[in-house]
Structure formats: structure tokens, C-alpha cells
Amino acid sequence: MIRIGILTLSDRASKGEYKDISGNAIREILQEWITNEIKFFYEVIPDDFELIKSNLIKFCDELNCDLIFTTGGTGPALRDVTPEATEAICDKVLPGFGELMRMESLKFVPTAILSRQTAGVRNKSFILNLPGQPKAIRECLEPVFPAIPYCVDLIGGNYIKTDESKMKVFRPKSAIKK
């Protein structure tokens, strides 16, 4: 079983002013691609540095999530602190994920350069910051997801299987399990 944490960062959604659709978009995409049994953990919280850190730590250390996806809080606004909170709790930061997501997003919108998305690992958990809009989530996740299952292998997490007709991932031949 793969354990996945989804953390939505939104002051207004956390107050119930509108329904979070970004977290559900992530869940739907992952259910489409991943063939393992999945258990999801889901939180909607305000853009608060300490709250983000504590929830990420809970997803990693207590709930033992293999994958953790954040949505929102990656722009330049004063309250956008998701990347800082992510980096603060990670053992290792993986900047290539953010670099590729920005490159891909620039094909759709020039303001993508304002994004500060990042990724990292804590213990056996992989963490990825995603944008707050469902369309942008898919646009960012598609180019980087092929590397995520092998990254999880390398950090000792559970083996993630995908429907190759929908999402073909990369692993060296020596890392492929039949």
C-alpha cells in the first residue's frame, strides 16, 4: 500500500470560504496513474510557516507517507511560505523538480517564473510543492512524475507501480520489480 499525504495551503479554503479543488485534483491524477492500493491523508490549512512544517512532519514521521504533495503557497506573496517550510524539514532538497516544473509552466504562462516550487526528502518520504490551480497541477506533475517512483526507491520507500498506458515512469533495469 502506498501512503500519500496531500496538504492544501489556502487561508480562505481553510476557513471554509470556498471548497478546495486542488487537493482533489492531485488525488484524481494519482489514482489515474498509480496502480498500487493507496491510502490518502488530506489536510487544508492556512499559509502559516509553522503549521505547514508541523503537518509535513506529521505526514512524514507519524503517518509514514511515501509521497507528500503540497498545493498552493509557492508564489512571491508575503504569505507564500510553502517552499521555505518544505526545505526547513527536509533532509535533502531536490531543486531539479522545481526547475523542470517552471520550465514546463513557462510554455503556458509567462508568470510561471514567479513560482518557487521545490521538492525534497525527509526519511523515506518524498515531498513535492505544486501550484494551486488544477490545470497547472497536471501541467507540472506530468513532466516530473516519471522520476518520482525511482526517487522513492532510492530513499527506501514503498515500490510505486503505475499504469504505463497513462504514466510511464523511469527506473534503471536493475531497479524494476516484476
Task: Please give the residue ranges for each predicted region.
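Non-catalytic beta/alpha edge segments that cap or flank active sites
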Residues: 1-178
